[in-house]
Amino acid sequence: MSQFTINIIFVGLSFALYFGIAIWARAGTTSEFYVAGGGVHPVVNGMATAADWMSAASFISMAGILAAGGYGASTYLMGWTGGYVLLAMLLAPYLRKFGKFTVPDFIGDRFYSKTAAMIAVICLIIASTTYVIGQMTGAGVAFSRFLEVENTTGLLIAAVVVFFYAVLGGMKGITYTQVAQYVVLMIAYTIPAVFISLELTGNPIPGLGLFSNHVEAGVPILTKLDQVVTDLGFTAYTADVPNKLNMVLFTLSLMIGTAGLPHVIIRFFTVPKVADARWTAGWTLVFISLLYFTAPAVGAMARLNLIDTIYPQGVAEAPINYDQRPDWMKTWEDTGLIKYNDLNNDGRIQMYNDSGLGAAELALTAAQADGGDVAAATAAVETARVAQDLELNGRFTAAGWKGNELDVNADILVLANPEIANLPPWVIGLIAAGGLAAALSTAAGYYWLFRQRSVMT
């Protein structure tokens, strides 16, 4: 059975589950349609809110951010989870207390101002539009890779799916569908991570595997990762951030932004009591933490596996030939999310930190072709080459390398991780279903916000 067929089966079964739940939990009253009757249990609502929050950004991009940024990227974990502490303490109970269906209704009633309510509508539309673009883009990326369709086609399929179960079931249907999506995305995220953790460290718990020894090297896996990335000219994975104040302020910004996300806030209208709103925030944090506990391990191990793929004999030896690249790399090249440019025409894939040399070389080529400022582009190339030589004692230049030749979009690392690690085809199909569940769950929440805006206005 082909990988495409397996992907279709997993995605098709997950969609059938969502449609079935939407039909089973369809709204019977206006209250059920808009706020699920106001009777959703905090645990159920916490799971639905977690799915609503763990969008394509968390499922698809989070581990990629950690893989690229290392310790410095942990601000995203702290900020996004810390936002729920603010939400539980300062917002959630009061939203439920006023008993309004929408955030602008709450703002207008709380401040006795229609102007304030209108400003809230405008802010909500701006935030929602920006956020939903990312979710639908994530769905398009997942569809284009796993179902082998164009990005635009993937976006349209996602929109139809969301429209169907949102309109049919209302907020009640969305709530229970998002519970199912949470289960799907957590299974899809965790199972590949368990396989990879076992393969690299022998520990079945990815979060603990991150602090275990590498099976082959016999040293802690983070030590192994630090060694290979620094040998390639990158900053050590566990390197401290140079400016702690920036890190703190960035974390606070993420916390405040998380607490104010409109598609998350609206979920606190669906519980029976004010106390349940606070409990919902607590349970949401628990369910989100289950994924975020695994994300650092997924990111670190994905980066190590990617480097091992390019340098199978170790980073001190020659990289693989482009013609011998694995099938998963060929597939992702078709999506445009992996790009290769043979700068020195040796047929091999040089992936390293070239201090911007590769980008400067491309800019010089473009300037020569388009009649641009060739002198400035040439100077930029020389500056980058000097910086590279100073940093790495000219090792790469001496080897004949002329710049980094492989550009890997960090957003693909979670989706490509099972393929990079040579996991079974059914695991790849499972993560396809999980990636789509993550993108669709948040898209449904934002569709509902737009629908409420149209009803309100």
Where are these predicted regions, by residue range?
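Residue-level recognition of pore/gate-forming positions within transmembrane alpha-helices
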Residues: 15, 52-53, 80-84, 124-125, ...
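Alpha-helical transmembrane segments of polytopic integral membrane proteins
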Residues: 26-27, 56-59, 63, 88, ...
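Membrane-interface "cap" regions at the ends of multi-pass membrane proteins
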Residues: 1-59, 166-169
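Membrane-helix boundary/linker segments in multi-pass transporters
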Residues: 21-40, 94-105, 114-115, 264-282
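Membrane-helix boundary/coupling elements in multi-pass transport proteins
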Residues: 123-141, 335, 339-344, 352-360, ...
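Helix-loop-helix module between adjacent transmembrane segments
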Residues: 18-19, 51, 74-169, 223-235, ...
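Loop-to-helix junctions at membrane interfaces in multi-pass transport proteins
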Residues: 2, 38-40, 44, 61-75, ...
